[in-house]
Amino acid sequence: MNAFNPAHFRAQFPALADAGIYLDSAATALKPQAVIDASDQFYRLSAGNVHRSQFAAAQRLTERYEAARERVAAWLNAPSGKDIVWTRGTTEAINMVAQSYVRPRLQPGDEILVSEAEHHANLVPWLMVAGQTGARVVKLPLGADRLPDIASLSALITPRSRVLAIGQMSNVTGGCPDLAQAIRLAHAAGMVVMVDGAQGAVHFPADVQALDIDFYAFSGHKLYGPTGIGALYGKSELLAAMSPWLGGGKMIAEVSFDGFTPQPAPYGLEAGTPNVAGVIGLSAALEWLAQSDIGQAENWSRSLASLAEEALAKRPGFRSFRCQQSSLLAFEFDGIHHSDLVTLLAESGIALRAGQHCAQPLLAALGVSGTLRASFAPYNTQDDVAALVHAVDRALEILVD
């Protein structure tokens, strides 16, 4: 592992040459040259499919594919690569858990606790399952600190509570709840815990064994990897108890017109030809990330968010929704619609997001219809902060009467 060097880190992202001032890494991270090269090499030099053909090139590709599974397991400190299921991303992983593990075990009146801070991907699947089974979704509200109020969790848990769905890190505020305490309380009541790691994975790799996490999902594209690839971690006994969600090739051990026998997990949960290129690219991203001190990189990103927040706070009407000095800065200006402001910022070459960030209940709890969100990554610079502040000043001159 090398000490973090902002200039060296930034130099590895060719897209920055044409991305403007890129402050939208919470939506998707840019890709380093190492990931681009791995993906290019796969398409130029690889032959065959995984877990199917017997010729040498296909066998080598299968070995790389399974080595990537082991790399993800090591990154999460999972006991085994067999505890990792490939998915298209966090959304598919959560839906898989909801439909394959939770739905068959729910009865009418059972309860699914979901934090108010969740991305829609960790809320809508539970609303769907509740509608299918007669269970109900119970809200774990925000506290005064804009984090899920873990202190109120004990009072919400009842004998009918079955699942806790909670995010590792908010994609709006950047706030990180006390996962360890939430998991302890849920497990004491016999509940299963689904952790959405989509936003948090790149900032704080989760130790799934130390936290005693039941299910954990993340997406490659927010982790400097390709789009369309993600992973689900599940405790081995929980994955073994899941019935296949999709049927098709590769996931069966035996099939006839009388029925079929699925492969054991994780393979029985991975129907069809997988996204091999995505797996190779994700593995390359994790290998590349391991070369830098992630903690130092995170501190750099946080310092940029603090610098931006301090500068913008000097402008009249500024309001920040940032939590815990995170690298995400969600903000608004009184009397100015976020869509108007982000349009003018885009014209100035500032790439960030405005709107509800796929978190409508959270925005409602914050009392706003939408925010702007500048999400800082280790490849950003103090010059990027200065450009953002300058562009905001120019926009305010136009928008403020």
Predicted regions and their residues:
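Pyridoxal 5′-phosphate
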Residues: 1-401
